[in-house]
Amino acid sequence: LLIDMADPGVTTKKITLISGKSPFCETFFDNVKVPKENLIGEENQGWTIAKKLLQHERNFISNFGLAGGGGSSTKGIVGIAKKYLGEENGMIADSDFRAAVTKHKMKEHAFGLTLQRANDEGAKASAASSIFKFYGTEHNKERYELMISALGNKGVVWSGDQADDNEKDITRAWLRTKANSIEGGTSEVQLNVIAKRVLDLPT
């Protein structure tokens, strides 16, 4: 059913996140009446339509696996690591951290090629969207975990003057990545969808 948010009985309440922002809200329906003309599709088939919408949403969210963290030398993961961990011969000084970043960037490149291949093949929103959404959001969380690690004690500040604006932005973005793996269906839900609809595993 399409419901007009201005209808009597429809109210919303902001949800304050750990970041202090409120981009989401909860909606309440108190004795709301909706005309039958607002029915989309067939009766009792709303979940079928909702699943299609979720597939498109998951496709969109999966791109965070590529877009998050920035690609510039000053804001990207490599630039952050060089600034806070030091640089030797143009490379990140800490060899263990350099290896972790290299592994991350290789996975990111492979993920980008996979998304491009799916696009070139004309793939539409499907259960495979769950694969892209799961991997993309988990990869984005990993990216920010690495950046927070490189920041050291600067990575636990999101207000005040103990960190600069860029450092605080990274911390806030790191917190935001936790929501990426919840919205559009949690990572656990995606794994269930992959098992059932992609791999056809027994339930």
Task: Indicate residue ranges for each PLM-predicted region.
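FAD-binding core of flavoproteins
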Residues: 1-79, 196, 201-203
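Alpha-helical interface subdomain recognition
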Residues: 55-203
